[in-house]
Amino acid sequence: MKALTATLLVGTALAAVPPQQPIQVPTEDSAWAKPLENLKDTFKTLGNDAKQAWNELASAFPDAINEYTLFSAPKKHTRRPDTHWDHIVRGSDVQSIWVEGADGQKRREVDGKLEKYDLRVKAVDPSKLGIDKVKQYSGYLDDKENDKHLFYWFFESRNDPKNDPVVLWLNGGPGCSSLTGLFLELGPASIDKNLKVVHNPYSWNSNASVIFLDQPVNVGFSYSGGSVSDTIAAGKDVYALLTLFFKQFPQYATQDFHIAGESYAGHYIPVFASEILSHKNRNINLQSVLIGNGLTDPLTQYPHYRPMACGEGGYPAVLDESTCRSMDNSLPRCLSMIESCYSSESAWLCVPASIYCNNAMIGPYQRTGQNPYDVRAKCEDGGSLCYSQLGYITEWLNQKSVMDALGVEVSSYDSCNMDINRNFLFHGDWMKPFHRVVPGLIDQIRVLIYAGDADFICNWLGNQAWTDALEWSGREKFAKAELKDLTIVDNENKGKNIGKVKSYGNFTFMRLFGGGHMVPLDQPEASLEFFNRWLGGEW
């Protein structure tokens, strides 16, 4: 569950959160310090909508505005000695390698500022955890200058690891662990209510090696004394991790590489892929990206919350007519605020847009008690983002035996860190126009946008709309392309219709029938079907 509903609901939660749950806004040593008092000149330049949103926030939560910091508290951790690890890859060593180019000139073997990074690697004994029989590695990427430590867990392909592609999986939030994707969606196993490991025959490592990464820092098993609060900053760390990982394991570097994720990964993935492609000399063979039920172009996607909640997305209405009309009435102001955010990309305009729009367009649905990740179901466990299985996963991962087997250095695991969620929101990251990066990707690699059609929070209507509207060289032909049936082709259910797909050039949109926010959870067979065919280059 790459980008959990809690991610998108931050604005709603902030607008409706009870006073005992303070909003964390930065104060000391921050440009945000007492924003409505100390930045009066900036405030005067805001539009009326943005001013009103800030005033409403300050009135509702005066103590929060003035007293709380934006940074998440560091996780308790104990660093393991270097002797614990099988390998430590020094970024400074990799950075110092020079080679002779085709033109006879000396150049660095790989680009990028890697001196401050190290990668620690430990082989995971498959027999200790019983997740899968394949070769596994876990460890940390260390940013020594900024005290950041990102946790990863690698699973080799069950099929042909010497030739199968490598995939990086990212959950969203922002602030949610990618181990959710591992155990709830597409990894080699799940965890049942008795904390037993259950084999997943539809795991995405059936025909690909998969890296699950907890990012940004202070998410899952990752930790830091500092913080990352925007998508751009997170991209540098991901590039460093992949570069050092493939340096340690060159046998995987020759394979095709893909980045996949969901929800807020609709922000992450375009930026991370762009960061990789910006380096001419690299050891990352990036071929495509896959974004599932993502948030990428809010201006185009937010108008589709009302239709999805009101019976126009292929499922019965969740909201009554009066509430639907109220959402329609709120939409113009919402879109005006997002347009201002797009024009300036200033937190002072993007934050009010997030707060107002999430309250107006997502809040009414959230208050029904229906699962925002699946319009067909009630939210069964609000504390675990509507899925009780997340509680089992969290309990299993918090076992000392599990942490020791993985070389974990933090004292506890949480599936989501809502401090990180708020940090990204209050830096204006939520509403920024990351779709503008996508045309540059399409020029170089394949891009898949897929969407389970029962999701509300990042629904298929909005994802189809932004892909049709995207400004790129093939826009007109893509928008006119026919949505064709997507059917199973390679097992006993051959011919079963699992969705719709359209494609032109390097750009593909896919609607998956019966899938919620987490397609691999709801439709595991269909998920593995399209995934394998995408990696095979069918679209």
From Swiss-Prot:
The active site is at residues 263, 455, 517. Its main location: other. Residues 1-17 form the signal peptide. GO terms for cellular component: fungal-type vacuole. Glycans are attached at residues 207, 506. InterPro entries: AB_hydrolase_fold (IPR029058), Peptidase_S10 (IPR001563), Propeptide_carboxypepY (IPR008442), Ser_caboxypep_ser_AS (IPR018202). It comes from the Eukaryota. This is Carboxypeptidase Y homolog A. It comes from Coccidioides posadasii (strain C735) (Valley fever fungus). The gene is cpyA.
